[in-house]
Amino acid sequence: MDYTNVYGVLHKTNFIIIMILIDGKKIAAELREELKKEVLNLKSKHNKIPGLTVILIGDMVPSQIYVRMKEKAANEVGLKSEVIRYPDSVEEKTVLDKIDELNKDESVSGILVQLPLPKHIDKQKVIEAISPGKDVDGFHPVNVGNLSSGYESTVPCTPLGCYLLIKKFEKNLSGKKAIIVGRSNLNGKP
């Protein structure tokens, strides 16, 4: 197969691929600035600052890095941010009780339980314990069902991020086709 690169366009018999270099860091910085303004607006109009609480169980380095990045981004845009850390040995009931407490706490706008969880903790039970309105990941069955049915819902971060990136370059997505590789609950469904 012989492809020719001409001004960012690859030509091959019967199809054309257009390539666009996307500066994700720049777009993320722009989005953070927009969010910062929204947070300030909420504070001035309603005297309320949204709050994100993340539950991190165990000491897996990738999870710690990911949570640290979330905490940094939340602080950058002016959100209240809290990370609750538990050891791998934490009992499931302790986690469920904490989620129940956070669901009732009006200063907490969003709850995120960092996955994966230790084997002795039922992931589905933990996900279902989070109030659908505070489910940051969009994993609660109510949110998954609403999203699958085309109703307003929390959208998982990765697909939403991809959508926002695409919208920066292509304003009208009507009639467009997309390929999603993978079928995980986080990225590939629904």
Model-derived regions: residue spans:
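Glycine-rich phosphate/diphosphate-binding loop of Rossmann-like nucleotide-binding domains
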Residues: 57-71, 153-190
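Non-catalytic terminal and connector segments of soluble metabolic enzymes
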Residues: 76-78, 101-103, 130-133
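Short hydrophobic alpha-helical segments enriched in small aliphatic residues
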Residues: 4-12
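Short beta-strand elements in bilobed, periplasmic/extracellular small-molecule ligand-binding domains
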Residues: 52, 74-89
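Short beta-strand segments enriched in small/hydrophobic residues
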Residues: 49-59
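Anion-binding alpha/beta catalytic cores of soluble intermediary-metabolism enzymes, centered on
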Residues: 113-178
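Short, well-structured alpha-helical segments in soluble
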Residues: 94-106
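Positively charged, low-complexity intrinsically disordered leader regions
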Residues: 19-46
